[in-house]
């Protein structure tokens, strides 16, 4: 019975040492995990302009000239619009229109901007 208590005490000491080492090294592992998980996206108006996401009706050149520091266009939307441009061989404006119509349709809104939900209040 004494050997059982000795084994339990050794296991307890070993676990305490492992916990202490883990606690002491947490700053290293947390920073390492964050650097692996997070990678900055190269998303700016200049990058969008260089990728052809610009037209006379959607002019982001003014943002570039004004040295706008905002992140640029939405990354998910730009990748879908670029895909539409490539797949349908259409211009940026046409692809943007197709994308916006799809987003509106997915959100139950018709092409005029009116909600298709019969419970929606549109007039007061």
UniProtKB/Swiss-Prot annotation:
InterPro entries the UniProt entry points to: DUF2015
Record's signal peptide: 1-24
Annotated GO CC locations: cytoplasm
Pfam family, one: DUF2015
Keywords tagged on the record: Signal
Family to which this protein belongs: Belongs to the UPF0357 family.
PANTHER family cross-referenced by the UniProt entry: UPF0357 PROTEIN YCL012C
Protein name stated in the entry: UPF0357 protein C1687.07
Organism: Schizosaccharomyces pombe (strain 972 / ATCC 24843)
């Amino acid at each position: 019975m004494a050997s059982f208590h000795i084994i339990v005490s050794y296991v307890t000491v070993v676990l305490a040492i492992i916990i202490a080492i883990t606690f002491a090294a947490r700053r290293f592992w947390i920073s390492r995990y964050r650097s692996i998980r997070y990678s900055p996206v190269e998303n700016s108006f200049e990058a969008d302009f260089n990728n052809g996401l610009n037209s006379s009706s959607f002019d982001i050149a003014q943002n570039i000239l004004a040295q706008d520091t905002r992140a640029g266009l939405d990354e998910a939307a730009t990748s879908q619009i670029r895909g539409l441009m490539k797949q349908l061989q259409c211009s940026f404006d046409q692809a943007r229109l197709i994308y916006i119509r799809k987003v509106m349709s997915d959100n139950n809104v018709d092409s005029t901007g009116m909600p298709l939900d019969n419970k929606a209040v549109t007039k007061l």
